């Protein structure tokens, strides 16, 4: 069965989802039937074809009136401001990928479903009242047909959760801290300008800028046993893509750095193949641009102090890796089937 998807919001993640769909060879499994975006069709086509981070798109892209052509495929372009006006029923949409970054609670999900979509996948953590939050590679097997409104978590949650799981399963995590070293984003300023967050009033290209993060809450949403046992901070740095995460955990069992690396490398080659990668090459952030993994462990940076404090450095392409996981989760949602009885919904 080919899953019919619509994309709401054609920004960084929305465009990368389309690119990843075609570049990963999953076009036979997923068809994009519509994209809803307030920008004009010319701008949408141009930014799909030319991307500063990811280069030129290999497929031919053009637009004609309110249609976007990718190769031989035709995608309908919409410019609806109100979710209730979206023609998902008319278009036979199975799953809406809401990549706006604006919508993310149950009411928004229900609006997509009322418009005719069978399921909704948000491209950010969303509210706690959604049916499920999925970190693909860790908990997607818990999805059920009645899970209609789902979050794909965040790029950083997808990056760090597999590593936390591996370390916890092997050594038993007692507590941890996370520092996200994240590339600049479009909620920052090119030059100094007003913002509700005074740190984000400053030019993104000229400073390392501390920002708020809900990553600790994202960790405990997937692993409730770590409630009040993880803390996180985040800084934005003057690069446009790729993120590094510094993870420090205190564990119950004594361990050596070489054993930690052996564990993570084995997982990358086995159970977490395609989700986690491992390297000991002397790489820098640009080398992970366009990497489809959720997490790439840098084995050269693993440290252990006092046999119980583990520090690791984990990289991710916060756009490309996450876009690929959006596609993985979409297929997982479709694979469990579509149950249209809203009263049957159970929370994951």
Curated annotation (Swiss-Prot):
<feature type="binding site">
    <location>
        <begin position="12"/>
        <end position="13"/>
    </location>
    <ligand>
        <name>NAD(+)</name>
    </ligand>
</feature>
<keyword id="KW-0963">Cytoplasm</keyword>
<dbReference type="InterPro" id="IPR020831">
    <property type="entry name" value="GlycerAld/Erythrose_P_DH"/>
</dbReference>
<dbReference type="InterPro" id="IPR006424">
    <property type="entry name" value="Glyceraldehyde-3-P_DH_1"/>
</dbReference>
<feature type="binding site">
    <location>
        <begin position="213"/>
        <end position="214"/>
    </location>
    <ligand>
        <name>substrate</name>
    </ligand>
</feature>
<keyword id="KW-0664">Pyridoxine biosynthesis</keyword>
<comment type="similarity">
    <text>Belongs to the glyceraldehyde-3-phosphate dehydrogenase family. Epd subfamily.</text>
</comment>
<dbReference type="GO" id="GO:0006006">
    <property type="term" value="P:glucose metabolic process"/>
</dbReference>
<feature type="site" description="Activates thiol group during catalysis">
    <location>
        <position position="182"/>
    </location>
</feature>
<dbReference type="GO" id="GO:0004365">
    <property type="term" value="F:glyceraldehyde-3-phosphate dehydrogenase (NAD+) (phosphorylating) activity"/>
</dbReference>
<dbReference type="GO" id="GO:0008615">
    <property type="term" value="P:pyridoxine biosynthetic process"/>
</dbReference>
<keyword id="KW-0520">NAD</keyword>
<comment type="pathway">
    <text>Cofactor biosynthesis; pyridoxine 5'-phosphate biosynthesis; pyridoxine 5'-phosphate from D-erythrose 4-phosphate: step 1/5.</text>
</comment>
<dbReference type="InterPro" id="IPR020828">
    <property type="entry name" value="GlycerAld_3-P_DH_NAD(P)-bd"/>
</dbReference>
<dbReference type="InterPro" id="IPR006422">
    <property type="entry name" value="E4P_DH_bac"/>
</dbReference>
<keyword id="KW-0560">Oxidoreductase</keyword>
<dbReference type="InterPro" id="IPR020830">
    <property type="entry name" value="GlycerAld_3-P_DH_AS"/>
</dbReference>
<dbReference type="GO" id="GO:0050661">
    <property type="term" value="F:NADP binding"/>
</dbReference>
<feature type="binding site">
    <location>
        <begin position="154"/>
        <end position="156"/>
    </location>
    <ligand>
        <name>substrate</name>
    </ligand>
</feature>
<dbReference type="InterPro" id="IPR020829">
    <property type="entry name" value="GlycerAld_3-P_DH_cat"/>
</dbReference>
<dbReference type="InterPro" id="IPR036291">
    <property type="entry name" value="NAD(P)-bd_dom_sf"/>
</dbReference>
<feature type="binding site">
    <location>
        <position position="81"/>
    </location>
    <ligand>
        <name>NAD(+)</name>
    </ligand>
</feature>
<feature type="active site" description="Nucleophile">
    <location>
        <position position="155"/>
    </location>
</feature>
<dbReference type="GO" id="GO:0042823">
    <property type="term" value="P:pyridoxal phosphate biosynthetic process"/>
</dbReference>
<dbReference type="Pfam" id="PF00044">
    <property type="entry name" value="Gp_dh_N"/>
</dbReference>
<dbReference type="GO" id="GO:0048001">
    <property type="term" value="F:erythrose-4-phosphate dehydrogenase activity"/>
</dbReference>
<protein>
    <recommendedName>
        <fullName>D-erythrose-4-phosphate dehydrogenase</fullName>
        <ecNumber>1.2.1.72</ecNumber>
    </recommendedName>
</protein>
<comment type="function">
    <text>Catalyzes the NAD-dependent conversion of D-erythrose 4-phosphate to 4-phosphoerythronate.</text>
</comment>
<dbReference type="GO" id="GO:0005829">
    <property type="term" value="C:cytosol"/>
</dbReference>
<dbReference type="Pfam" id="PF02800">
    <property type="entry name" value="Gp_dh_C"/>
</dbReference>
<dbReference type="GO" id="GO:0051287">
    <property type="term" value="F:NAD binding"/>
</dbReference>
<comment type="subunit">
    <text>Homotetramer.</text>
</comment>
<feature type="binding site">
    <location>
        <position position="318"/>
    </location>
    <ligand>
        <name>NAD(+)</name>
    </ligand>
</feature>
<feature type="binding site">
    <location>
        <position position="200"/>
    </location>
    <ligand>
        <name>substrate</name>
    </ligand>
</feature>
<feature type="binding site">
    <location>
        <position position="236"/>
    </location>
    <ligand>
        <name>substrate</name>
    </ligand>
</feature>
